[in-house]
């Protein structure tokens, strides 16, 4: 469905399963819209953005298959490596700049998170989504990226409050 979050209704299907998967998606929340995307096999990275500037990337390595709802919220479902060691500095920089441009183009406000995948097939990176309100628990991806940039959790929260005040007053 087009209105789900946290990959709770993300499915990877074989071509013969498309019809059933599409109909199942329409049944969730009685929606009349679904999003169908090609599957890109690759490595996933999260790019936190604070005040329009990219934080260090976080590489997400799911224990099993996709970084779906179960792998996101199940203890041990994924490893999160920040900063990533499997990606060269130039590609990290390109992804960070793309995250900043998406933040600006979508007129995001104060903080967000851009999720990317680097294709195993061709090494190109693709933006999967922008999260306008990314998770903010101490274990969430944005606070992990901020910690790698030198922010303690309380300092990140304070920075978000200060930037929010600047944007409004």
Where are these regions (language model features)?
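Single conserved hydrophobic/aromatic residue that forms the stacking wall/gate
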Residues: 1-7, 11
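A generic alpha-helix surface/boundary motif
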Residues: 5, 97, 139-141
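Short beta-strand-to-turn element immediately C-terminal to the catalytic PLP-Schiff-base lysine
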Residues: 12-14, 49-51, 119, 128, ...
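Phosphate-binding site of ATP-dependent enzymes
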Residues: 15-97, 125-126
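Conserved metal-phosphate-binding beta-hairpin within the catalytic cores
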Residues: 38, 103-136, 146
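Active-site "cap" helix and flanking loop/linker of ATP-utilizing ligase/carboxylase catalytic domains
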Residues: 59-112, 144-169
